[in-house]
């Protein structure tokens, strides 16, 4: 996996097709043609597809303490707005561990609407696709 990650980082995402057939019968010409015709990720804004459709307050996991397990969340000290470009739940859990109340918003939300939430901080999540497209 690391080798593939390094390859993609250095040379970009290659064209390829993954196929499965229980009998082992493959139309290689068709599979190769599918790969050649694939337009790639350049200019693709996948964040619009994976972002949350509406704003929500994340109420996920309780705080984890070594030797004690999960504890009740303490009163939240900081208000964070997380702009969802494909956010991972683990990131939200980390914020919770640092006593943050996290409001997750769609990636297309206007700046004025984010400011109205009066956050102590704004987090832009990572996401899929071409960063230049988002």
What are these regions (language model features)?
Residues 128-134:
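Glycine/threonine-rich flexible loop motifs
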Residues 1-118, 131:
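RNA-binding accessory domains that recognize and position tRNA/RNA substrates
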Residues 121-125:
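Structural motif
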């Amino acid at each position: 996996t690391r080798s593939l990650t390094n390859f993609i980082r250095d040379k970009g995402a290659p064209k390829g097709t993954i196929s499965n057939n229980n009998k082992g019968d493959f139309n290689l010409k068709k599979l190769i043609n599918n790969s050649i015709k694939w337009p790639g990720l350049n200019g693709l804004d996948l964040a619009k597809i994976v972002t949350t459709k509406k704003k929500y307050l994340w109420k996920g996991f309780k705080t984890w303490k070594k030797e004690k397990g999960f504890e009740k969340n303490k009163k939240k000290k900081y208000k964070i707005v997380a702009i969802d470009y494909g956010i991972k739940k683990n990131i939200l859990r980390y914020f919770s561990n640092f006593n943050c109340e996290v409001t997750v918003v769609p990636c297309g939300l206007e700046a004025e609407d984010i400011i109205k939430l009066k956050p102590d901080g704004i987090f832009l999540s990572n996401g899929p696709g071409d960063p230049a497209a988002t």
